[in-house]
Amino acid sequence: MQIGQRIGTPLSESATRVMLLGAGELGKEVIIALQRLGVEVIAVDRYPNAPGHQVAHRAHVIDMTDRAALRALVEQERPHLIVPEIEAIATDELAAIESAGLAEVIPTARATQLTMNREGIRRLAAEELGLPTSPYAFADSLDELRAGIAKVGYPCVVKPVMSSSGKGQSVLRGDADVEPAWQYAMAGGRVNHGRVIVEGFIDFEYEITQLTVRAINPASGEVSTYFCDPIGHVQVAGDYVESWQPQPMSPLALERSREVAHKVTAALGGRGLFGVELFVRGDDVWFSEVSPRPHDTGLVTLCSQRFSEFELHARAILGLPVDTSLRAPGASAVIYGGLDEAGIAFEGVAAALAVPNADLRLFGKPESFVKRRMGVALATGETTDEARSRAKQAAAAVRPVSAK
């Protein structure tokens, strides 16, 4: 496939085929963006009827950590591009697939290997690139965890080296918290490696996501780096509950944020959109994490930017030009399931959409849990404060109910 030169017709011999590994709500939006550009999309997830399965040309259910199953599916479908949307993937097999020339992995197989767990990316950022981070240590046992805590001090955060959306994370304020945190981390890891990172607290004012796009510059034909306006967000127990764009920052803090984002994404390489998470206090910036894919806090870009993070990702991976301009101040607010049940319904949708400048995305997840993210309310306003108020009002109007 000639990147950026031609796109074929879906379901024909000329098709440009993209396989998404992970078909949740973020993957669903990437699929829609790709399909609008005429791409044939294959969605893969670990459970049937995932949000992205519902809109893809073809859907498959496999254990993506199973190297043989992953290789067999790639050989069956023959995608031109493989786009990982989650961490729980046999990344060593992706590297083998890429080196064998079966498909191009986005952004690169190496990037997926480094970012699949917190250890790889933290060591790259802090030890190789010299970026400012919180103090940290890694532990393979309860005794090592205690030693790590002695190094970084209380309060601290313990996380599995491989998990997502806050799973397995604990805040520790004293010795009594250590053993429960270890047990919780072991239960919360996506792939149970029995290894955790312990991070010292940073006294920050706010957190941001700096969406960073590595895309072909049409003027030079080479990869350039583009930045979206910074996204502010609130997290509870490691899960994002609302986000807004733009986040006000000092000029120096913004400059430093983009320097950090540029360094870490350049080190990862390839094309695509990256979500770089940073802590900020005054003019000071610390690197937290990076995802080589659209970020949940970036759902706000569905209303705030000319092109959403999903459209930017689609364009970048296809070698097409990008435009990261802001359209209006915007905000997103999460809609939780509120109950444990399959096939729930939603009431209050009309009331939510009656909020000025508001919109909804109901993800279509087949099963609800009390704290599962089932949708998001979006809104724009004259200011981010107005947008946040509207998004929260719209989210509060939606009521998940039993369909029984």
Swiss-Prot record:
GO cellular component terms, A-Z: cytosol
Positions that bind N(1)-(5-phospho-beta-D-ribosyl)glycinamide: 25-26, 85, 296, 365, 372-373
Pfam families linked to this entry: ATP-grasp, PurT_C, RS_preATP-grasp-like
EC supergroup of this enzyme: ligase
GO molecular function, one term: magnesium ion binding
Record keywords: ATP-binding, Ligase, Magnesium, Metal-binding, Nucleotide-binding, Purine biosynthesis
Segments of skewed composition (Low complexity): 392-404
Record-listed Mg(2+) binding positions: 277, 289
Reaction(s) this enzyme catalyzes, per UniProt: N(1)-(5-phospho-beta-D-ribosyl)glycinamide + formate + ATP = N(2)-formyl-N(1)-(5-phospho-beta-D-ribosyl)glycinamide + ADP + phosphate + H(+)
InterPro entries found in the cross-reference section: ATP-grasp, ATP-grasp_carboxylate-amine, ATP_grasp_subdomain_1, PreATP-grasp_dom_sf, PurT, PurT/PurK_preATP-grasp, PurT_C, Rudment_hybrid_motif
Residue ranges of the region described as Disordered: 384-404
UniProt keyword annotation of DNA-binding present: no
Coiled coil feature spans: none
EC numbers on record: 6.3.1.21
Pathway noted in the entry: Purine metabolism; IMP biosynthesis via de novo pathway; N(2)-formyl-N(1)-(5-phospho-D-ribosyl)glycinamide from N(1)-(5-phospho-D-ribosyl)glycinamide (formate route): step 1/1
GO biological process assignments: 'de novo' IMP biosynthetic process
Annotated ranges, domain ATP-grasp: 123-318
Family, similarity comment: Belongs to the PurK/PurT family.
Role of this protein: Involved in the de novo purine biosynthesis. Catalyzes the transfer of formate to 5-phospho-ribosyl-glycinamide (GAR), producing 5-phospho-ribosyl-N-formylglycinamide (FGAR). Formate is provided by PurU via hydrolysis of 10-formyl-tetrahydrofolate.
Cited HAMAP family: PurT
Quaternary assembly: Homodimer.
Protein name: Formate-dependent phosphoribosylglycinamide formyltransferase
